[in-house]
């Protein structure tokens, strides 16, 4: 299972939110590159980089940070936050992203999102299916759509999508444990999908459980920044899997 630390960016700084609420912002580090290098030094190979300014303004903003981390580490970066146009994707990939995550666009403009899957390949495009009471949430979680989560994922699986990041908003940034039941349900109803669990990870013991469920990866944010899970523990998990 991939261990994928998260770096969320506002104003070029590394922050965390609770339940996606911009008013709960805590700045953890002024220098995201420093944070990324620290992850890499502990054997981490993947990074989930989110442009929260971009998510709010519906266009890519913090691509310079992406460029910096991609050029000065070997981390495989998936980048998301407000990607809406072909130009946004071009900038993201040219700046060094390995994959991009599209969430709101997949709900609001499925034609464009499907074109991306065809144009860039299913290994490059991740479906960001953020859930609120098993409905899909969009626009940095400021809106809830009418889309039911599992049919939404199944529909895109039929279009060729392979990777899905699912964040249960009720859990995100709350350090209350992940949505094991929700992930088990998704995995049983979408055979073959590479599911990346996100939101609520709070202790190291949850990681083997997610691996056992069959998750492809797990994104860890606040638990790292608040030392609930140490980088040493992650390093051992990566080495021993």
Curated annotation (Swiss-Prot):
Record GO cellular component, one term: cytoplasm
Listed InterPro entries: Aldolase_TIM, His_biosynth, HisA_bact_arch, Isoase_HisA-like, Isoase_HisA-like_bact, RibuloseP-bd_barrel
Pfam families xref list: His_biosynth
Active site: 8, 130
Protein biosynthesis keyword on record: no
Main location: cytoplasm
EC number: 5.3.1.16
Any one of the GO BP annotations: L-tryptophan biosynthetic process
Catalytic activity field: 1-(5-phospho-beta-D-ribosyl)-5-[(5-phospho-beta-D-ribosylamino)methylideneamino]imidazole-4-carboxamide = 5-[(5-phospho-1-deoxy-D-ribulos-1-ylimino)methylamino]-1-(5-phospho-beta-D-ribosyl)imidazole-4-carboxamide
Protein name, UniProt field: 1-(5-phosphoribosyl)-5-[(5-phosphoribosylamino)methylideneamino] imidazole-4-carboxamide isomerase
Organism: Flavobacterium psychrophilum (strain ATCC 49511 / DSM 21280 / CIP 103535 / JIP02/86)
């Amino acid at each position: 299972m991939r261990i994928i630390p998260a770096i969320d960016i506002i104003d070029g700084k590394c922050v965390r939110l609770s339940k996606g609420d911009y008013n709960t912002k805590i700045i953890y580090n002024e220098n995201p590159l420093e944070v990324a290098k620290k992850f890499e030094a502990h054997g981490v190979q993947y990074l989930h980089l989110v442009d929260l300014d971009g998510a709010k303004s519906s266009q890519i903003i913090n691509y310079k940070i992406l460029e910096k981390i991609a050029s000065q580490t070997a981390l495989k970066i998936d980048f998301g936050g407000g990607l809406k146009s072909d130009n946004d994707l071009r900038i993201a990939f040219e700046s060094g992203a390995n994959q991009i995550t599209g969430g709101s666009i997949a709900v609001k403009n499925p034609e464009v999102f499907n074109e991306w899957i065809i144009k860039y390949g299913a290994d490059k495009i991740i479906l960001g299916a953020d859930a609120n009471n098993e409905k899909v949430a969009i626009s940095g979680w400021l809106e809830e759509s009418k889309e039911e989560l599992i049919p939404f994922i199944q529909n895109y699986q039929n279009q060729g999508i392979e990777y899905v990041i699912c964040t249960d908003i009720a859990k995100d940034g709350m350090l209350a444990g992940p949505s094991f039941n929700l992930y088990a349900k998704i995995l049983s109803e979408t055979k073959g999908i590479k599911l990346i669990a996100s939101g609520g990870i709070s202790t190291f013991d949850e990681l083997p459980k997610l691996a056992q469920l069959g998750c492809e990866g797990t994104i860890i944010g606040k638990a790292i920044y608040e030392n609930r899970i140490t980088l040493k523990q992650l390093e051992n998990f990566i080495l021993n899997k």
